[in-house]
A protein has these predicted regions:
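Solvent-exposed beta-strand/loop surfaces, strongest in extracytoplasmic domains of secreted
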Residues: 1-178
Length: 178
């Protein structure tokens, strides 16, 4: 009989970049004669809704279905899974501090690579150790500095929320940037 024990799962951590990510599922090396099978993905917090392209931040459960008959195994139409068949797509934004020479012109304290943050996220910044947060948008840019002294005295934190379409309470807060 076909069971989850005959399959091997590889790949448990991915970094969000807007692209689809999925682990590798194969039959174990010493297992022969299994027919073709279909891999399905589900968000851990909603096991009813199949995800066609796992690319959003979150934890996913992997299930195998529609195993075709092979030389040594019968067909199987139910779902097969294992407690270890999980993988995560983690939010890991690329945030860099200004590194060029100061020339008296204003330069943003940091830059954020947009492709590393999910669309529709709320991005905020704080320059007072997280006491006050300001939403970052086209009307409110990242604070700028013009001199080395200003740069040394400006500390900024970034907070990203609402990045997971299935949950409104996810929040990621950065380390301090200076």
């Amino acid at each position: 009989d076909v069971t989850s024990d005959i399959f091997e799962f590889n790949g448990s951590e991915f970094t969000y970049d807007g692209n689809t990510h999925s682990p590798n599922i194969t039959t174990k090396n010493n297992i022969k004669g299994v027919g073709n099978f279909t891999v399905k993905y589900f968000k851990e917090d909603n096991l009813q809704a199949e995800i066609n392209e796992p690319k959003d931040v979150g934890t996913y459960i992997v299930k195998i279905t529609a195993v075709e008959e092979g030389d040594f195994y019968n067909a199987y139409s139910g779902y097969l899974t294992n407690d270890n068949w999980k993988f995560a797509i983690n939010l890991t934004p690329t945030i860099t501090t200004y590194k060029d020479e100061y020339d008296g012109n204003p330069h943003p304290v940091i830059s954020i690579e947009e492709s590393t943050i999910p669309p529709n996220s709320i991005i905020e910044y704080s320059v007072d150790n997280g006491q006050t947060w300001y939403i970052l948008n086209s009307n409110d840019n990242i604070p700028t500095v013009s001199t080395v002294r200003e740069a040394e005295n400006t500390k900024i934190f970034i907070r990203i929320s609402n990045f997971n379409s299935n949950s409104n309470d996810d929040t990621w807060t950065s380390q301090e940037y200076q």
